A protein has these predicted regions:
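Surface-exposed helix-capping loop/turn segments at secondary-structure junctions
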Residues: 148-160, 360-368
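Acidic, glycine-rich two-metal-ion catalytic cores of nucleic acid-processing enzymes
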Residues: 2-3, 18, 28-48, 55-58, ...
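Short secondary-structure junctions
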Residues: 73-75, 123, 364-369
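Acidic two-metal-ion nuclease catalytic site recognized across multiple nuclease folds
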Residues: 160-170
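Helical catalytic core of nucleic-acid polymerases
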Residues: 83-85, 89, 93-155, 168-178, ...
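Generic structural signal for residues in well-ordered beta-strands
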Residues: 88-91, 368, 404-406
Length: 423
């Protein structure tokens, strides 16, 4: 049913509010970030009936989007995308559900109709193309997606990881919605969790936000959206070394991790830093295992992790209990598995700290605009005061367990270290 009047809307809402459903948003322009596009249609399948709510389409009598809050489960292809358009609870991301078990991204390549392909190719410059693609063709495509989702729900519903589905996707959606201001206007990032290690990639519109070059000046265009604002970056110090230390119960003394390591190697700070990361991500020589108690414990941990992986056919993360299955990984060895585990530890610790941070900063004017592996970027409104920055720093550091360095600047290229201001 295409819902075009109040009578049809009442029937739909009565049915929708009493059942679980699949919801698929159809934006006006699929080439734009969801924050820059608007809804054209909303496809809803209650497993018994299907409905299409026309919000902005040339063929229909359009309606205002109703309140769709429900206590029932709502399944969708992409929870993060749906939350850009609708404020809903109990939304289950079927793509994530399936990925948690199979390690594979759902195949979406053959879901377009010939009308979608033809019109997108012929009118590739036209904005809001979905508003002129026939509604019946949108329904045809949505039926294919809905069938695929139902098949995956039947197979993998027991593998829903609530922490990933709710907590992590909500955190990333929060950052995405804030956007980043540039000298050319606001741009938006898009995090992708479908990576072998679980560490999100982050790119949209030709920009790889997870790998912005620090040296070529490409960061210079990122500025504050506020007249009295600056960008502030908080960067974890020796993050991976400290994460693993926590895992293996090794306590670093106060101060610099690399100066501590230099004492074992008999080298200067920079060389100690280079060697520690070389050993952490690669081969640990026998003499280092003998002289360095940290890497002795790391070596034992790697061997233990490898044995668990071989015996159980999976390893499980500490924080969110995500399983990485042997059958989904290729050409694995002990060190490669350890590297995957480090990245998963990093990601999940970051998500845990975001879950603590976001409720505390939501009401401030300043915006959290980027998270990248071991750093967090804030668009800081001076009116929020240094107390705001101190609050963020304290939450990130988790009782001083993971010290952060702080820098700020009028743009993301020219950043000045101000860590000493917070000592």
């Amino acid at each position: 049913m295409i819902v075009e009047n109040n009578k049809q809307l009442k029937k739909f809402l009565k049915d929708f509010k009493s059942k679980e459903s699949i919801i698929l948003p159809i934006e006006q322009d699929s080439n734009l970030h969801p924050q820059k596009s608007k809804l054209s249609l909303l496809y809803v399948n209650t497993f018994d009936d299907e409905y299409v709510l026309p919000i902005n389409h040339n063929e229909c009598l359009n309606i205002d989007l109703p309140n769709l809050k429900t206590k029932n489960k709502v399944y969708t292809l992409d929870r993060k995308k749906l939350l850009h358009f609708l404020d809903l609870d109990n939304v289950i991301d079927v793509s994530m559900m399936s990925y948690m078990r199979t390690g594979k991204v759902l195949e979406l390549d053959n879901l377009n109709t010939t009308a979608h392909d033809f019109l997108n190719m012929k009118f590739y410059k036209k904005k809001n193309i979905n508003t002129v693609i026939p509604v019946l063709k949108h329904i045809e495509k949505c039926r294919k997606i809905s069938t695929m989702l139902q098949n995956n729900i039947e197979k993998y519903s027991e593998y829903v990881n609530v922490s990933y589905n709710d907590e992590i996707l909500n955190n990333l959606s929060f950052i995405e919605k804030n956007g980043l201001m540039t000298t050319e206007g606001k741009v938006f990032s898009e995090y992708n969790l479908y990576t072998s290690t679980g560490r999100p990639s982050n790119r949209f519109g030709g920009i790889n936000f997870a790998a912005l070059n620090k040296k070529d000046g490409s960061r210079k265009k990122f500025i504050s959206r506020f007249k009295n604002g600056v960008l502030v970056e908080m960067d974890f110090d020796a993050y991976h070394l400290r994460l693993i230390a926590d895992k293996i119960n090794y306590e670093f003394p106060k101060g610099s991790v690399h100066e501590h390591m230099a004492q074992f190697y008999g080298v200067d700070y920079e060389e100690a830093k280079r060697l520690s990361f070389q050993y952490l991500y690669g081969y640990i020589p026998e003499d280092v295992i003998q002289i360095n108690p940290y890497f002795s414990k790391v070596h034992d941990y790697i061997e233990g992790l490898w044995n668990i992986y071989k015996n159980d056919d999976f390893v499980e993360s500490d924080i969110y209990k995500r399983r990485i299955y042997k059958e989904n990984l290729l050409d694995m060895n002990a060190n490669k598995l350890f590297n995957y585990t480090i990245q998963l530890m990093e990601t999940e610790n970051n998500m845990k700290v975001l879950s603590a941070l976001i409720p505390e900063i939501r009401e401030y004017k300043s915006k959290l605009i980027l998270y990248s592996y071991d750093s967090f970027l804030l668009d800081f409104n001076i009116e929020d005061g240094l107390d705001y920055l101190m609050k963020v720093k304290n939450i990130l550091e988790q009782d001083k367990k993971y010290p952060v360095k702080v820098s700020w600047g009028l743009n993301y290229h020219d950043m000045e270290d101000i860590t000493e201001k917070f000592v």
